[in-house]
Amino acid sequence: MTNLRKTHPLMKIVNSSFIDLPAPSNISSWWNFGSLLGVCLIIQILTGLFLAMHYTSDTMTAFSSVTHICRDVNYGWLIRYLHANGASMFFICLFLHVGRGLYYGSYMYLETWNIGVLLLFAVMATAFMGYVLPWGQMSFWGATVITNLLSAIPYIGSDLVEWIWGGFSVDKATLTRFFAFHFILPFIIAALAGVHLLFLHETGSNNPSGLCSDADKIPFHPYYTIKDILGVLLLILVLMSLVLFSPDLLGDPDNYTPANPLNTPPHIKPEWYFLFAYAILRSIPNKLGGVLALALSILILAVVPFLHTSKQRSMMFRPFSQCLFWILVADLLTLTWIGGQPVEHPFIIIGQLASILYFLLILVLMPITSLFENNLLKW
């Protein structure tokens, strides 16, 4: 009798995705982040579900309901901080996952890559709406500032903003709809992640060398299941350390003050994982230009596959491209730092230079360097 896992309609899907899947024998720990993102999503959905049981999406009671969760619900503080810091871990894994894709040329799998870019947008939208829900000062003003950016769209801008707000300012209607979207989006993300995997398994995984690995495959289980479990344990270790020792390390103290439309905080800034995009937005003095640059800072990822001029897929054997890649990483860290600083000298000019360098590296310097490397190898 054939093994049940290979014949049962449901189990054979699991079998071909996680057990008997042929995987390259040389994929490094940089390939762990896909499974870690799956674990992050599960943690977020579960903790979010339990938070939603006690949260009320009303401007009068939202802040106090979060306080109630932390003070009165059994382990409510743990669930709340797991959810808040789980989002940070989610984005750390996301950035490393995207960075891996850029470094090793995984973007050459176009469908997988484009679904990934879509997933990134969906996760960013979900995180933004989630940040509004506790209804603290930074929640309210962050929502006001970011939604207001849409008013820069010609002709329909102001109507669009009022339509999203459900009124003439960020108020009860806005909070209620943000809660509804924040609840449904993670399930859409889970479905998209399934499509992401579907497309990936059409081609098989890339590997550090960027070469075809068909001649040397190993079964996913037990080799990569064990490797993924190690990654998950490390993720949980870091997350629990953060939650139990310094849960507010990555948060904003302003969010412990209830939202007050009459009092603007001195420095309005989003969560740390949006700071790089926020810095790019602020570095352009024109409102519409800033909004376009903000959108393009993420959308540029969709253009990357068409800018691949190298005859090699991976950067493993391309030292000049490697150098530019790490300059890009340093540039993004600089932008993240600038996004959290006040708008004054010298931060303004540093932010503008870092923003120019970001687009210059991806659109111009990397493709030219790849062509140069082709010539060095007489290709």
Curated annotation (Swiss-Prot):
* Entries under Pfam families matching the protein: Cytochrom_B_C (PF00032), Cytochrome_B (PF00033)
Highest taxon of the lineage = Eukaryota
Q: Which gene encodes it?
A: MT-CYB
Q: Which terms does the record give in the GO molecular function aspect? A: metal ion binding; ubiquinol-cytochrome-c reductase activity
The record gives the membrane topology as: Multi-pass membrane protein
Q: How does it assemble?
A: The cytochrome bc1 complex contains 11 subunits: 3 respiratory subunits (MT-CYB, CYC1 and UQCRFS1), 2 core proteins (UQCRC1 and UQCRC2) and 6 low-molecular weight proteins (UQCRH/QCR6, UQCRB/QCR7, UQCRQ/QCR8, UQCR10/QCR9, UQCR11/QCR10 and a cleavage product of UQCRFS1). This cytochrome bc1 complex then forms a dimer.
Tell me the residue numbers annotated for binding heme b b562.
H83, H182
Keywords on record: Electron transport, Heme, Iron, Membrane, Metal-binding, Mitochondrion, Mitochondrion inner membrane, Respiratory chain, Transmembrane, Transmembrane helix, Transport, Ubiquinone
The molecule here is called Cytochrome b
Biological process (GO) annotations held by this record are: mitochondrial electron transport, ubiquinol to cytochrome c
The UniProt entry, under SUPFAM superfamilies, shows:
a domain/subunit of cytochrome bc1 complex (Ubiquinol-cytochrome c reductase), Transmembrane di-heme cytochromes
Keyword Transmembrane in the entry? The reply is yes
